[in-house]
């Protein structure tokens, strides 16, 4: 047996920090706990699961010898061989049907995806055009405002032009106006 002195020579084991028990209430908390555990020891390799291969049936045999019918007359073992071959063939056909259906659904999904993408692009183009139109309108209004400021800065030239044009405009307005008579009741 080991002496008590030999046991005391060994250094004491480092104590682990007590961890509080945390029960995640939702998926976000569970993910947070997993991330915290991973980040405690960043040197440790992270286990990344590989994608599981889909099950596929065994390829059919290239050559089947002495195929008997389903009757057991040829021998008691022949029926079991036939039954297993038939089961595998049915499995293979079901698998091929399922794969064809899956490919069909995938193709339909891709078509819908393309259709939605085109519709979204059309909508985006329409909105982009509208934004551009508004932007141009604002720029045009800004230019008009700047032109008006410039005209106000040069009042002598502008006032003469406005005076002559306003006289002509008032004369045409007077000629165009007809007396309006409103007769109320009898």
UniProtKB/Swiss-Prot annotation:
Residues 168-179 have a biased composition (Acidic residues). Residues 51-143 are annotated as: Required for RNA-binding. Residues 91-178 form a coiled coil. GO terms for biological process: mRNA processing; renal system process; RNA splicing. Induction: By IL11. Keywords: Coiled coil, mRNA processing, mRNA splicing, Nucleus, Spliceosome. It is found in: Nucleus; Nucleus, Nucleolus. Residues 116-186 are annotated as: Disordered. Residues 126-143 have a biased composition (Basic residues). Residues 126-138 are annotated as: Required for nuclear localization. One of its GO terms (molecular function) is double-stranded RNA binding. One of its GO terms (cellular component) is nucleolus. Broadly expressed, with highest levels in liver, kidney, brain and heart. Residues 1-50 are annotated as: Interaction with EIF2AK2. Signal peptide: none annotated. Residues 116-125, 144-155 have a biased composition (Basic and acidic residues). Component of the pre-catalytic and post-catalytic spliceosome complexes. Interacts with EIF2AK2. Belongs to the PRKRIP1 family. Required for pre-mRNA splicing as component of the spliceosome. Binds double-stranded RNA. Inhibits EIF2AK2 kinase activity. This is PRKR-interacting protein 1. It comes from Mus musculus.
């Amino acid at each position: 047996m080991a002496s008590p002195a030999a046991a005391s020579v060994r250094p004491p084991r480092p104590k682990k920090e007590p961890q509080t028990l945390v029960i995640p209430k939702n998926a976000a908390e569970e993910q947070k706990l997993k991330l915290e555990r991973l980040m405690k020891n960043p040197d440790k390799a992270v286990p990344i699961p590989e994608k599981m291969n889909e099950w596929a049936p065994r390829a059919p045999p290239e050559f089947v010898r002495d195929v008997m019918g389903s009757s057991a007359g040829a021998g008691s073992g022949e029926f079991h061989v036939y039954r297993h071959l038939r089961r595998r063939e049915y499995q293979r056909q079901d698998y091929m049907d399922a794969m064809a259906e899956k490919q069909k659904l995938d193709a339909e999904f891709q078509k819908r995806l393309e259709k939605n993408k085109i519709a979204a692009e059309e909508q985006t183009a329409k909105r982009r055009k509208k934004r551009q139109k508004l932007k141009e309108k604002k720029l045009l209004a800004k230019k008009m405002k700047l032109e008006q400021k410039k005209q106000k800065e040069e009042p002598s030239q502008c006032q003469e032009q406005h005076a002559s044009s306003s006289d002509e405009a008032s004369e045409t307005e007077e000629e165009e106006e007809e007396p309006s008579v409103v007769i109320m009741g009898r």
